[in-house]
């Protein structure tokens, strides 16, 4: 076995683990190529969060920009590293008023899963791939459809109030969704 190339595998520059103390919460969207589905869900999530939290960022939010402490990213299990978003995905985003500019495809790496507080996948196969990477990802990895269904069943009054911070509320939401898994039909 050899050590991974720089920029590959487990990163050394970021030591904070998922769900740990910190003022950011990372959402990772995963699909196959990271040129269509996951870029769409990433950018729509950023757009909705910026709208909901009242953050106006000229030119949109770039990858890694925090919106109220929330960082939204994406990667692909067979990611087209460095590839642009597909044209039809850009059209979908434009139709919803979201910014498609500046996107660059990424291959899913261990460090992405390690740093993510919430992983949302396009399919159950993607979820299985993320979980098989290890890193205690099972309780924070959901298909987008599954997470949506679970979140709709959570009473917002059971979550920390927004004045305690968006990040704490997001962490509590993921814990509540994980706890509901297997209980809802």
Could you describe each region identified by the protein language model?
Residues 2-116, 125-128, 132, 136-139:
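Conserved active-site segments centered on acidic
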Residues 2-5, 17-19, 131-185:
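Phosphate-binding/catalytic loops
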Residues 123-126, 173:
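Bulky hydrophobic/aromatic packing residues
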């Amino acid at each position: 076995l050899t050590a991974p190339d720089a920029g590959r595998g487990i990163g050394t520059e970021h030591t904070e683990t998922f769900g740990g103390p910190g003022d950011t919460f990372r959402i990772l969207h995963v699909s196959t190529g990271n040129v269509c589905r996951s870029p769409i869900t990433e950018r729509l999530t950023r757009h909705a969060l910026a709208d909901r939290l009242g953050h106006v960022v000229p030119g949109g939010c770039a990858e890694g920009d925090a919106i109220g402490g929330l960082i939204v990213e994406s990667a692909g299990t067979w990611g087209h590293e460095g590839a642009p978003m597909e044209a039809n995905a850009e059209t979908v985003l434009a139709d919803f008023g979201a910014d498609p500019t500046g996107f660059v495809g990424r291959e899913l790496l261990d460090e992405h899963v390690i740093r993510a507080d919430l992983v949302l996948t396009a399919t159950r196969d993607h979820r299985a791939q993320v979980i098989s990477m290890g890193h205690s990802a099972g309780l924070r990895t959901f298909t987008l459809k599954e997470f949506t269904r679970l979140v709709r069943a959570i009473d917002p009054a059971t979550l920390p109030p927004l004045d305690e911070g968006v990040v704490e509320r997001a962490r509590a939401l993921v814990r509540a969704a994980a706890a509901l898994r297997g209980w809802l039909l």
